[in-house]
């Protein structure tokens, strides 16, 4: 097993010295997020906590009300926003602390690709692929759009699934 990312102490090692050497206290974090988190006492959720259930959902929003090209994947004239309906206080802390909306707006190209795939892989084409490869429809969607049920297992999994669900044909 090889891990190339940074690990962060969930419980501050200077305040909780016994937790400094505990492997269960280490959570994956990008270098920038690790530095940001170390400067605050705001409570965020531990992704390994058995009760972890982030309510954060991503969606797109018109940047220019007259431009609907983005709905077909033809432009990046949209914003990526976080639907804050029913979120927990710890979710809101994460959104604010890590400036998530600003960060995810740098992924418009990824969202645009998902929008195009959602249009290209219509119901008929997905049915064809399911038959050709003898694969379940849910599994096929996971392969096409790059997400897993356990979002912590794959980068951008939550983001990819949320954007896909916004644009897929049923």
Question: In which residue ranges do the predicted regions lie?
Answer:
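Domain-level detector of nuclease and nuclease-like folds
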Residues: 35-96
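Short Cys/His-rich metal-coordination motifs, predominantly Zn2+-binding knuckles/fingers
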Residues: 1, 32-33
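Histidine-centered nuclease catalytic patch
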Residues: 1-26, 39-46, 50-56
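Sequence-level detector for tyrosine residue identity
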Residues: 10-11, 16, 24, 48, ...
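The −1 position to Zn-ligating cysteines in a subset of zinc-ribbon hairpins
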Residues: 29
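C-terminal, charged low-complexity interaction regions
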Residues: 76-170
């Amino acid at each position: 097993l090889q891990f190339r990312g940074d690990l962060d102490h969930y419980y501050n090692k200077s305040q909780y010295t016994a937790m400094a050497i505990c492997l269960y206290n280490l959570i994956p974090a990008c270098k920038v997020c690790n530095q940001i988190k170390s400067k605050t006492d705001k409570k965020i959720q531990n992704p390994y906590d058995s009760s972890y259930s982030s309510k954060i959902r991503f969606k797109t929003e018109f940047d220019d009300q007259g431009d609907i090209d983005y709905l077909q994947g033809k432009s990046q004239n949209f914003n990526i926003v976080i639907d804050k309906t029913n979120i927990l206080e710890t979710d809101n802390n994460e959104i604010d602390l890590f400036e998530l909306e600003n960060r995810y707006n740098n992924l418009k190209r990824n969202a645009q690709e998902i929008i195009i795939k959602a249009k290209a892989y219509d119901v008929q084409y997905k049915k064809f692929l399911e038959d050709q490869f003898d694969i379940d429809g849910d599994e096929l969607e996971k392969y096409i759009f790059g997400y897993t049920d356990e979002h912590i297992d794959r980068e951008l999994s939550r983001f990819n699934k949320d954007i896909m669900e916004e644009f897929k044909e049923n």
